[in-house]
Structure formats: structure tokens, C-alpha cells
């Protein structure tokens, strides 16, 4: 779907020119707006869903990491520090829910990040805890400074961010500076892994650089950027089969890639996401990151774009390994449209915007083609392996399901949000509302929201008894922001961004502001 060929229903919609807000799109593309009462009612409904999930978590699971929303039990999969609370903070701030915000701030002040009985993931802890606290700090010290009256409670967020960084930084103490991911913070040990993944290594720089910029201690930025340097200049050269597209695993001892398997799927995904986001964060310091993203984006369009045989109008991203394309993808991968749209708007590149919209449309198809209206965990368009039971689905939808699970992932709604912000086209908000409504209809329990075992079965199959913390951080936030008023943290056209979202949807203030 390209900007020049969007076809939208105009029923009950007003049409205005987007040229003022989105000058790079030109005046030929109308911005369509729903009735303001409808927009407000949808924003209120999403806030109510957030509060429903929070109330259940608070009653049955707090201060543990996550609620088990079927049994009303709890889990501690993220170190036992209250992941859902910290992950919910920035969304609660944006929704201006002072009661929840203060509950979370009180909790953060009590966390001892030096103590846990579980293995700690550097990656997950960075994006959820460190990102959540830094975002809360930036929002409450900035555009939402009137929400919390006691400034000392806000200051604790930065203090605790530094405490967490100090606990985690031994992960980078390796011969190369490429960190271990799985840590024993009590002993200062690790799992002895020989390699680390592309996304795990390449999704640290934003949070750790922000921590340095706020504290004035360059240690954190230096550590994360040293690790990133091996990804920006990949060795051996064979690890970069196409310009900007690199392998999936890095040797911890010497920083060299151990393969040349390329994808935007889970395990690789957020490395590419952060390249352009670091440029948004500070274009002066991170011009090389932008150059690498542009190279990767152009190579992706040329070498990885794939069209199902029964639906050549759709675009998915294949993977690549030693001359062979893998024709399968994941819900996780559907962040890709948003990445192209962010890069396209920031760099004024219509080709990236158009390709991003193609990817968004393809991911929408995975939602629009199931019985629940929710997309599957993974899918394929490889005609050599279509199950007979899904032949009709492939004929109609251009894909078949390889895992029908849904664990409250946000990536499709996330890319719908970027499409809405990049184009102003009302269609994308309608897609957000449809996706949110499906989650609300099929995943809601008496105490929260559960995962589903099969999005293409009646009632979503059976339920997973787990509510991931990213429901609060991402699904609720991206859904809400599409119907909320414009604000400093919303994605803006061109170079107008005051905030940039980490991969857990926590907005951090860009360096120049």
C-alpha cells in the first residue's frame, strides 16, 4: 500500500490537508478524522482496560513480576523486582493516572536491584526496568511535571537507574566488551556463553547512553557503545552479505560474527530498530548508526522483500542464509513497518515510507484473516510446506500459521501507530481500534488479560495463564496514544521528535531537548 494509492472509506469523516503537519507527503493526501466524541470514548476505553489490568495485578500479584490472570496467581520471570509495575509507569504517566503513578514510584524506591534468586537477562532488564525508570524520569521532569507533587519521588527514578546500571555493568567485562546476557548478579558470574545475539548486543545503547547523559557519568554509554561498535563494523566481512545486513551471533571473546544469517525476526530485530532511533536521539553523535540503518533498509527492500504467490499484493520480509531465502516471519517482526516509517519521516524518504506502509499492510493481513482478528506468533508463505488443513487460508490470505499463539505482543499495533503518525490516515487508527478490541474481547479475564493458544480457533483456543508486563508498556500505550491528544512524547514528522521510544515503548527525551 503506497501513499499515492491509499483507498479509504470517507463515511462520516472530515477531510483536511496534511501538508502543514506532514509537508513531505504533499497536499494530495487527505488526513481523515473521526468524530471527536468517538476518539475520546476510545481513549477512555483503553484507559479503562489499562486500569482493569493494573487493578488485577495490584490485587493478586504485586509486587511480583506478573499476574497469572486465569488462576489469579503470580510469577517472577523478570528477577522478582516487580516488572509489571515498572513497565506500567510510563503508560500511567501518559494517561495521567496519578494514583497508579504514585503507587509505582513508592515501589521503585524499595527495589534492591542487587538481590534476586533468578538469572538476570541484561537485555530484558535494560529494556523493561532501566528503560521504564528513565522514561518515567524524563516524562515527570518534563512535559508531565505537574502530575507528582513530591519531586524527591521522581529523583528516585534516576538514583535507582544508576543503581541498576552499576549492578549490571559487570556484564561488559569481557575481552572484547561484547557483554554476556545471562547474569548471576550475586556472584558476578554468567552462563559461560561463547556468543551473544545481535539484538541482545545491539539493543542497549539507547538506555545506557541516556543514563550517562542524565548522570554525567560516561561509563554506561561507553560500555554499550563499545559493544555496538562490533556490529557497526562487522568482521569478518562475510558476516555482511548485503550492505547493512549482518549476521545473528557475535563471539564474546573477540567481537567477530560467527555467522551470516540475516533477518528482521526475533533475535535480530531490535538491532535494526535502534540504529535509526539512536540517530533520532542525537543526530550529531549517531550519524554512523543512521548510515548503517539506511544501508540495511535499502538492502532489505532489494533482497528480503517477498510476496506470497497467492497474494502478490502483500509484502513480508524473508530471512537469508547462504544464498537461500527463508519464507517465514513472526509477530515480533511486524515492528519492521514502524521502523521504516520512522526512518522515512525523519530522513524525508518517501521510498522508505511507502515500503513501511507495505509492511504494515502485510501485518494487518495476518490480523484480518484470523477468526479472532489477532495475528499469530509465527507464519509462513513457503509453498513447499503448506499443511493441507491451511491450504484455503493460504489461498485467501497469502500465509499459513506455524504457531497460532498470541502472548499479548504489541508489534502490529505499534506499526499501525507509526503509520497513523506518518500519514494521518484514519484507516490506521481504525486498524488499531480493531486490534485493541479483539484483544479486549478474547484475552480479557476477570483480573487482567491472558494469552491465547490459537488465534484462528473459536474463542482463541485455550488461555495462557500469564500476563506479560509489555501489555502495560506497549499494547496499552500504543493503542491509547493513537486516540490521545498530540503531546511532546508523540512521534512527530521530520526532525521534530522530542522523545524516542525504546523497544519496550518507553519514551525517553532526545538528547537535543
Curated annotation (Swiss-Prot):
Residues 1-21 form the signal peptide. Its cofactor is Ca(2+); Mg(2+). Ca(2+) binds at residue 503. Pfam families: Glyco_hydro_47. One of its GO terms (cellular component) is membrane. Its main location: cytoplasm. InterPro entries: 6hp_glycosidase-like_sf, Glyco_hydro_47, Glycosyl_Hydrolase_47, Seven-hairpin_glycosidases. Pathway: Protein modification; protein glycosylation. One of its GO terms (biological process) is protein glycosylation. One of its GO terms (molecular function) is calcium ion binding. It is found in: Cytoplasmic vesicle lumen. Its EC number is 3.2.1.113. The keyword Translocase does not apply. Monomer. PANTHER family: MANNOSYL-OLIGOSACCHARIDE ALPHA-1,2-MANNOSIDASE 1B, MANNOSYL-OLIGOSACCHARIDE ALPHA-1,2-MANNOSIDASE-RELATED. This is Probable mannosyl-oligosaccharide alpha-1,2-mannosidase 1B. It comes from Aspergillus niger (strain ATCC MYA-4892 / CBS 513.88 / FGSC A1513).
